[in-house]
Swiss-Prot record:
Alphabetized Pfam families for the sequence: GDP_Man_Dehyd
GO BP term, pick one: nucleotide-sugar metabolic process
Catalytic machinery residues: D143, E144, Y166
Coiled-coil features, chain-numbered ranges: none
Cofactors that this protein relies on: NAD(+)
Record family assignment: Belongs to the NAD(P)-dependent epimerase/dehydratase family. dTDP-glucose dehydratase subfamily.
Residues annotated as binding substrate: T142
Protein name per UniProt: dTDP-D-glucose 4,6-dehydratase
Top-tier EC class: lyase
UniProt gene name: Tgds
InterPro entries assigned: dTDP_Gluc_deHydtase (IPR005888), NAD(P)-bd_dom (IPR016040), NAD(P)-bd_dom_sf (IPR036291)
Length: 355
């Protein structure tokens, strides 16, 4: 681990009550979690490990970048020697593993990369954490591992039936993580969350993409019919969910992190058009919609029960109307937080295949 790859602000490992490793910390959700951890737990050292892929931005961490209990290390979870050394040097107590390739559209054309990063990288990380004797390992998965459903609500015991390469890679990684609990009683916890939205999300995902397209006077590109429905959870709420799992989650358990708020993709587009373009008629709203060919597979719904995490004291609080207005305003000012953000606005990924 080179001196150039890290920010030396912390004291020796023993000077903090806990040392928490957050992988993918320059990404969307993890950066929100890091900011909360750094500010709410001043006696915890928060170590951010990120390789700074295209969707990451250290601007997400500016509120805490100079804090004494925060450290950034640039590195790759797929580098087993580096990861082992990191655990030895940093004396990590807790891991929150967010680092992943997450864009479903991209997974269809770069499936091998998703397998490599999401499955192999997770295996490298959980094995290193096990060998280091970490006291809790939280693996961040997705509701998409359940596959789609029109009416059946999934709970944590529902079978995994993923339908796209991204979801398949996350499901496979879950199996590796869970095996360390089954084999060694290594204290792992798995979370599966609904779609999360809010500031700092790279604009390849549906909500920031639609917002950014409209703010650049371009139409919302809808895959297929747009009748697919998604549950949307605001970033501040999901942060509270992860802090709840961190403090109250039981080893070996899985927790759904969901919301009852559900909306079709076409309705989402229309609401954003009315909010941003202030359209006055249905025809005027429709003029800002462009229907394009669908994904190779596009699940209709991911209905999910979240009573298990509710029993730990967490429920979403931020109303859609409040969350979406904050999000729209953030992108109005911060779209260029990523140097390649314009690429994300194309209907389909334009990056070359991984292999």
């Amino acid at each position: 681990m080179s001196a150039a790859s890290r920010e030396e602000r912390s004291g020796p490992p023993g000077s903090f009550a806990k040392r928490v490793l957050v992988t993918g910390g320059a990404g969307f959700i993890a950066s929100h979690v890091i900011v909360s951890l750094v500010e709410d737990y001043p006696d915890y050292m928060i170590v951010n490990l990120d390789k700074l892929d295209y969707c990451a931005s250290l601007k997400n961490l500016e509120p805490v970048s100079n804090k004494q209990n925060y450290k950034f290390i640039q590195g790759d979870i797929c580098d087993s020697h580096f990861v082992k050394l990191l655990f030895e040097v940093e004396k990590i107590d807790i891991v929150l593993h967010f680092a992943a390739q997450t864009h479903v559209d991209l997974s269809f054309v770069r499936a091998f990369e998703f397998t490599y990063v999401n499955v192999y990288g997770t295996h490298v990380l959980v094995n290193a954490a096990y060998e280091a004797g970490v006291e809790k390992f939280i693996y961040v998965s997705t509701d998409e591992v359940y596959g789609g459903s029109l009416d059946q609500e999934f709970d944590e015991s529902s079978p995994k039936q993923p339908t796209n390469p991204y979801a398949s890679s996350k499901a496979a990684a879950e199996c590796f993580v869970q095996s360390y609990w089954e084999r060694y009683k290594f204290p792992v916890v798995i979370t599966r969350s609904s779609n999360v939205y809010g500031p700092h999300q790279y604009p390849e995902k549906v909500i920031p993409k639609f917002i950014s397209l409209l703010q650049h006077n371009r139409k919302c590109c809808i895959h297929g019919s747009g009748l697919q429905r998604r549950n949307f959870l605001y970033a501040a709420d999901v942060v509270e969910a992860f802090l709840t799992v961190l403090t109250k989650g039981e080893p070996g358990e899985i927790y759904n992190i969901g919301t009852n708020f559900e909306m079709s993709v076409v309705q989402l587009a229309k609401e954003l058009i009315q909010l941003i373009k202030e359209t006055n008629s249905e025809s005027e709203t429709e003029s800002w919609v462009d229907y394009v060919s669908d994904r190779p597979h596009n699940d209709m719904r991911y209905p999910m029960k979240s009573e298990k995490i509710h029993s730990l004291g967490w429920k979403p609080k931020v109303p859609w109307e409040e969350g979406i207005k904050k999000t729209v305003e953030w992108y109005r000012k911060n779209f260029h937080n990523w140097k390649n953000a314009e690429k994300a606005l194309e209907p389909f990924p334009v990056q070359p295949p991984f292999m």
